């Protein structure tokens, strides 16, 4: 190569470039990093200097292979020293070749610089000696950097200066050896220079480890010698060489640029920096790594070489440090880019290491504090959380911290509370609950205001005791039937904070809900004792006692407003809790057994699955079935009302007060989102029912009837889905207009006002179902669907039948309810087959709902609805006309007729219905032929 360089520079350059490209490619294949072309390397190649440097580098690589073991072995022989140095050279060379990928620009630059310096030296001195010298010089540039860095690594790894001393000795010996071998002043000088640089690096690390001023002086002298030697030709070499060096070496490069003391000072400063980093090296591998990688440009293959050699030497010297160094080595490529910030990063790493150590110890408390802060941000739960945290910390600082950390993680991921330490978390939450009950947020206060203060206080006290007693508190909670509801209240309160605090508190709430579920299950026996009390009024009383459902009827009434206020505190919980409240109310309304309600409440949070909800609904169904039919209808009404109230914006709010509802809401949040489509259908159903309030006129009871039937029937899952969908919609942020807004968003046909009106009307209807037919009238009036109580009563008498009819409008639940009301549905499905009479298709909302539900039904048919005629597609005017002869439908038609007259002329809706006909036939049902005939009888819609 030297001959080529001297005789055929062009060919030499070409070969050099090819070799560089090949080496870069090999490095890339090796996977170090993506090689980048180094301008300096190219320039050096152009100069042809690289050739010898690389030849020497290859030789040094060979030496390095033998010396890498020697490096780890130590300072035993000048040969080893020389190998160490050559190993550094070879490491740099090798890494110039291999580490090119990671340090390619640096490696090649150093290679180029080393070769350039070496060949400059060669050009200045005999080429033959200069080859060795170039080798020492070139590798003195590269290998010295590499060796220094390697030695620095080794020394930093050793953090004891042993590798430093070894490398220093090796370097010193190698200086002698090099001098002897080269016999050239340049060789000697370059070797000492090279030694001085590795020595400087070693000295740097020695400074780091041993802080030997001797090393610094020696390295400085070597640096000076090198600087002097390379004053003209070595400057480039040292610049390239030292720039690859790190900050200290960069300083040397600067010193080289500013030869003399400055370079020494820079080297010493760099060494001092290295010393500091080495001091911290064992502690701060990242700092060392950063120091190792001074710059992308400063770093050179030697960095990788250092890493590798360092690993080998550390294997021999300090495996532990080797591991740390390896970690640092892993960091090197990254930190190499940060090399310029090495000093700052070193300090930053030191501070970070210290901070990390402190943070590790303080992390749990910080997490708790974060939660506390989040809770405090919640405002409502601020004092509660503070007190709860204080009490919980006082009583279980250690475990509270762990659960808090767990909860933070969980809260972030919103995993089940089960993920966190149940016992300690339960205790923590119990304490928080107890304090939450004591500090009862407005939700709890509302419930307390509802006359539950004594029990709330009692529950709060019991919860506090539980907090104090830990799991015993849980047992006590389970022992107290009201505690589970109360704890739910606490959870409700806490969910309020959760709503504000966000996922963390939600995780806490979820976890505590799981606890509540267990407690409620335990309370189940106690609640069973109160089953008999589950009479419709007593169920309400039980709710009041439980602090959960006392507000349900009230929720429908003024209690709902209070709960709304409480819920306002928990906006996040509004949607989730709203849906939960719907389900919860269903549960608790069906709560002939409070335990079942609690269980089901807990079940939903436990499983957070529609399955859970379905299961809970099934349990509710069982409870409903177990309870008297009157209670069942009442509970069903309330359930429906709760569900629909959840659908409506009020529902989520007043139900947000229900902690189990929060559980359900969270459980459903996951599913509710997935079941958004169902929710939309539910919305359609709700809106349809709202628009179809004729069917719903008495159908608060009808709703209760078919909802009960749904629950009793196989529709439990559907209802759960409906509730889930309602949840999803609430979660969607449709503030109770969820159904309407969802339908509106989905269809865009219904105006938000109409949707809201429908939702509110339906809510009113539901509330009226709970409160009486007068509410139905209100609903109908509000909807503009003027339905007389007689009609309502007629429909009430026909509830079962009309429920299917109404259910038919409901894509999910109403149809399912129809299916759920087997006898009624089957007996009346012919009449209800075409709910046109019940559905005021003339009302745009009804038509929108019909079209919407029909299209959705087509998109995803529900076999549960098969038994139910497709009211949504059925609504064409012919259907109402054809079916109005049916007596029930006649009465319904009478009811609708006023609505039609109020809203539109009877004839007007027909074209609109015809427009809706384009939707399709919908699901197969027994009345398909009738529907088809009715449609055929009608003129084609324009």
Swiss-Prot record:
Species for this entry: Mus musculus (Mouse)
Name recorded for this polypeptide: Apolipoprotein B receptor
Any single GO CC term annotated in Swiss-Prot or TrEMBL for this entry: plasma membrane
Membrane topology note: Peripheral membrane protein
Region: Disordered, residue numbers: 66-212, 240-269, 283-487, 501-607, 671-942
Compositional bias per record (Basic and acidic residues), positions renumbered to this chain: 106-123, 132-143, 240-252, 312-330, 338-352, 384-397, 444-458, 466-475, 514-531, 672-687
Record InterPro entries: ApolipoprotB_rcpt
Acidic residues: bias regions: 353-370, 415-425, 709-721
Keyword Transport: yes
Cell location: Cell membrane
Gene induction: Increased in high-fat diet ATM (adipose tissue macrophages).
Alphabetical GO biological process terms: cholesterol metabolic process; lipid transport; triglyceride metabolic process
């Amino acid at each position: 190569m030297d001959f080529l360089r001297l005789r055929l520079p062009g060919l030499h350059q070409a070969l050099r470039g090819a070799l560089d490209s090949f080496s870069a490619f090999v490095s890339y294949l090796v996977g170090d990093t993506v090689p980048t072309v180094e301008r300096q390397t190219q320039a050096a190649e152009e100069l042809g200097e690289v050739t010898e440097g690389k030849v020497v580098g290859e030789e040094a690589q060979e030496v390095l292979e033998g010396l890498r073991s020697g490096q780890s072995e130590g300072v035993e022989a000048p040969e080893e020293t020389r190998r160490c140095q050559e190993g550094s050279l070879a490491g740099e060379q090798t890494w110039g070749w291999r580490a090119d990928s990671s340090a390619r620009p640096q490696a090649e630059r150093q290679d180029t610089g080393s070769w350039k310096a070496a060949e400059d030296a060669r050009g200045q001195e005999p080429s033959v000696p200069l080859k060795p010298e170039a080798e020492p010089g070139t590798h003195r540039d590269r290998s010295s950097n590499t060796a220094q860095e390697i030695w620095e690594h080794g020394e930093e790894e050793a953090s004891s200066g042993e590798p430093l001393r070894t490398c220093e000795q090796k370097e010193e010996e190698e200086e002698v050896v090099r001098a002897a071998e080269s016999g050239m002043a340049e060789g000697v000088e370059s070797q000492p220079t090279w030694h001085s640089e590795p020595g400087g690096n070693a000295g740097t690390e020695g400074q780091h480890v041993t802080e030997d001023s001797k090393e610094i002086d020696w390295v400085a002298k070597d640096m000076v010698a090198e600087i002097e030697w390379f004053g003209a030709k070595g400057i480039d070499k040292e610049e390239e060489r030292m720039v690859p060096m790190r900050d200290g070496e960069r300083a040397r490069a600067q010193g080289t640029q500013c030869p003399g003391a400055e370079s020494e000072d820079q080297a010493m400063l760099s060494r001092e920096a290295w010393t500091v980093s080495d001091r911290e090296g064992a502690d701060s591998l990242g700092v060392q790594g950063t120091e190792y990688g001074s710059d992308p440009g400063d770093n050179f293959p030697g960095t990788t070489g250092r890493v590798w050699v360092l690993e080998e030497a550390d294997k021999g010297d300090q495996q532990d440090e080797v591991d740390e160094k390896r970690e640092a080595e892993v960091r090197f490529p990254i930190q190499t880019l940060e090399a310029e910030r090495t000093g700052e990063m070193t300090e930053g790493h030191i501070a970070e290491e210290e901070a990390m150590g402190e943070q590790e110890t303080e992390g749990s408390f910080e997490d708790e504090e974060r939660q506390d802060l989040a809770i405090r941000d919640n405002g409502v739960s601020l004092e509660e959380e503070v007190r709860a945290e204080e009490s919980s910390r006082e009583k279980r600082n250690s475990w509270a911290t762990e659960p808090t950390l767990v909860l933070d993680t969980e809260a972030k991921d919103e995993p089940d509370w089960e993920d966190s330490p149940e016992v300690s978390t339960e205790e923590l939450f119990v304490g928080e609950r107890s304090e939450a009950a004591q500090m009862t947020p407005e939700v709890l206060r509302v419930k307390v205001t509802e006359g539950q203060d004594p029990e709330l206080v009692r529950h709060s006290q019991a919860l506090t005791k539980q907090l104090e007693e830990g799991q015993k508190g849980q047992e006590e909670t389970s022992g107290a039937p009201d505690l589970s509801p109360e704890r739910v209240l606490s959870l409700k309160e806490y969910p309020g904070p959760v709503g504000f605090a966000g996922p963390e508190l939600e995780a806490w709430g979820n976890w505590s809900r799981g606890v509540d579920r267990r407690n409620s299950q335990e309370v189940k026996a106690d609640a069973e004792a109160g089953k008999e009390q589950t009479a419709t009024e007593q169920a309400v009383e039980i709710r009041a006692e439980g602090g959960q459902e006392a507000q349900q009827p009230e929720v429908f009434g003024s209690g709902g407003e209070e709960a709304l206020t409480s819920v306002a505190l928990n906006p996040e919980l509004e949607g989730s809790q709203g849906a939960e409240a719907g389900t919860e109310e269903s549960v608790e309304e069906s709560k002939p057994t409070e335990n079942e309600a609690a269980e089901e409440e807990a079940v939903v949070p436990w499983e957070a699955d529609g399955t859970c909800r379905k299961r809970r609904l099934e349990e509710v169904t069982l409870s409903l079935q177990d309870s008297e039919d009157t209670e069942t209808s009442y509970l069903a009404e309330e359930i429906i009302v709760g569900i629909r109230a959840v659908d409506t914006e009020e529902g989520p709010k007043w139900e947000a007060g229900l902690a189990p509802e929060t559980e359900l809401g969270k459980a459903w949040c996951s599913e509710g989102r997935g079941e958004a489509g169902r929710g939309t259908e539910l919305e359609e159903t709700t809106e349809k029912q709202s628009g179809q309030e004729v069917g719903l006129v008495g159908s608060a009871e009808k709703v209760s009837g078919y909802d009960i039937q749904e629950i009793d029937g196989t529709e439990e899952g559907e209802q759960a889905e409906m509730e889930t969908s309602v949840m999803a919609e609430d979660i969607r942020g449709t503030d109770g207009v969820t159904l309407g807004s969802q339908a509106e968003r989905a269809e865009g046909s219904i105006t938000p006002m109409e949707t809201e009106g429908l939702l509110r009307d339906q809510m009113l209807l539901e509330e009226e179902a709970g409160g009486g037919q007068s509410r139905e009238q209100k609903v109908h009036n509000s909807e503009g669907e003027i339905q007389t109580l007689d009609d309502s009563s007629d429909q009430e008498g026909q509830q079962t039948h009309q429920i299917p009819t109404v259910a038919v409008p409901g894509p999910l639940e109403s149809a399912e309810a129809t299916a759920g009301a087997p006898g009624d549905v089957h007996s009346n499905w012919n009449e209800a087959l075409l709910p046109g009479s019940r559905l005021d298709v003339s009302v745009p909302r009804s038509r929108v709902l019909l079209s919407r539900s029909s299209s959705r039904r087509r998109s995803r048919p529900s076999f549960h609805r098969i038994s139910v005629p497709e009211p949504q597609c059925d609504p064409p005017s012919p259907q109402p006309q054809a079916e109005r002869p049916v007596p029930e439908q006649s009465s319904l038609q009478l009811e609708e007729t006023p609505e039609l007259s109020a809203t539109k002329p009877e004839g007007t809706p027909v074209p609109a219905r015809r427009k809706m006909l384009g939707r399709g036939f919908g699901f197969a049902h027994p009345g398909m032929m009738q529907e088809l005939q009715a449609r055929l009888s009608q003129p084609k819609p324009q």
